């Protein structure tokens, strides 16, 4: 989904969903494929809830949790950052690409603390401390999502320490605080920007709630969770009425898409086995297997392709959808698949452990590890 969104960076502006021809409508939808991020946060919440549940009564459970998360995220991130820095460095030598690609980041464009923030996935909040709150500076536009992920993992680890078998209650307490801040308007305070309490925890919590509803809740608890997710979806959609700017719509659409996806997980659970064996879902298994690698490596090539075609005048709705988008998918696969084989797979915890980790998700979506 994010490949589609990033391929649209230089396409002609679309006014509204029904303001033009079919290409216009498709571009309007494609420019909102960033909803893959809130959906990814829901999947992450579901998986982490499963991990916490499986480890909460085991000796050394916290250590296992931390090791898995560290090796899953950081070594591939470091290699991807090195690749992106090299790609930007080469692209910067081209006057043509330097003129048209706004995403290029030279090595000197980031301070030492910003490099540390990118490599540790802390840049979303580290700038408050070391850059006087001037705002984050990302080497790649996808790193901000990992900054939130690491915060989610940290909070989940604290839940494991403080509550053990009652970790879900800890997540409920954090969710209540996050919801109160959001409803009161305090979540949008500049001082909270980049922290999990700026509203993004809610997206993660939807996944945790879905896992609890499916695996642990009694009927009354399941009904309460479904009701809360449904209410959130409806309220977010109603809040979007009359809004046209992406800024105004962004978080309401994030809430609506995340809550509705969590609802889908709960509702579709009885058919997991059937869906996982359906011929229609089989291609997603191959894509999902390498999705984190594609996620980490697609940003630079896709934005360069989009900028290059825009630079020669091919930025219409038709040319972007018919030429730029297919090339973006191809480039993402050509870079992401070798990255998976050579880098990510080396840091996996083995086939048996990977299969166990995948089982934290309903079978029908288990292959989808990251938005792509």
Q: Which residue stretches match the model-derived regions?
A:
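Membrane-interface helix-loop-helix regions
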Residues: 21-25, 29, 73-148, 256-269
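His/acidic/aromatic-lined binding-pocket segments of jelly-roll/cupin-type domains
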Residues: 38-40, 202
């Amino acid at each position: 989904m994010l490949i589609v969104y990033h391929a649209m960076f230089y396409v002609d502006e679309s006014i509204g969903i029904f303001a033009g021809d079919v290409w216009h409508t498709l571009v309007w939808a494609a420019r909102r494929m960033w909803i893959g991020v809130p959906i990814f946060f829901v999947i992450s919440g579901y998986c982490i809830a499963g991990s916490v549940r499986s480890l909460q009564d085991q000796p050394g459970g916290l250590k296992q949790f931390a090791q898995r998360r560290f090796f899953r995220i950081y070594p591939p991130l470091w290699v991807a950052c090195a690749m992106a820095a090299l790609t930007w460095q080469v692209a910067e030598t081209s006057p043509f690409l330097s003129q048209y690609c706004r995403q290029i980041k030279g090595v000197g464009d980031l301070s030492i603390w910003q490099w540390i923030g990118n490599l540790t996935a802390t840049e979303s909040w580290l700038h408050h401390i070391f850059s006087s709150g001037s705002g984050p500076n990302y080497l790649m536009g996808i790193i901000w999502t990992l900054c939130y992920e690491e915060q989610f993992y940290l909070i989940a680890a604290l839940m494991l320490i403080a509550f053990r078998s009652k970790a879900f209650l800890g997540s409920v307490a954090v969710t209540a605080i996050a919801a109160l801040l959001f409803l009161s308007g305090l979540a949008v305070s500049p001082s909270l920007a980049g922290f999990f309490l700026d509203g993004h925890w809610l997206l993660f919590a939807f996944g945790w709630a879905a896992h609890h509803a499916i695996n642990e809740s009694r009927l009354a608890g399941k009904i309460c969770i479904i009701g809360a997710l449904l209410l959130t979806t409806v309220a977010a959609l109603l809040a979007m009425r009359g809004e046209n700017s992406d800024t105004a719509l962004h978080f309401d659409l994030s809430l609506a898409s995340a809550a509705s996806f969590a609802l889908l997980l709960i509702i579709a659970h009885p058919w997991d086995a059937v869906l996982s064996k359906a011929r229609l879902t089989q291609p997603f298994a191959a894509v999902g297997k390498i999705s984190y690698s594609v996620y980490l490596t697609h940003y630079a090539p896709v934005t360069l392709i989009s900028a290059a075609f825009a630079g020669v005048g091919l930025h219409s709705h038709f040319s972007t959808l018919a030429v730029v988008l297919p090339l973006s998918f191809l480039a993402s696969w050509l870079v992401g698949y070798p990255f998976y084989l050579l880098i990510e797979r080396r840091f996996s915890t083995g086939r048996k452990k990977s299969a166990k980790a995948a089982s934290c998700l309903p079978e029908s979506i288990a292959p989808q590890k990251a938005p792509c």
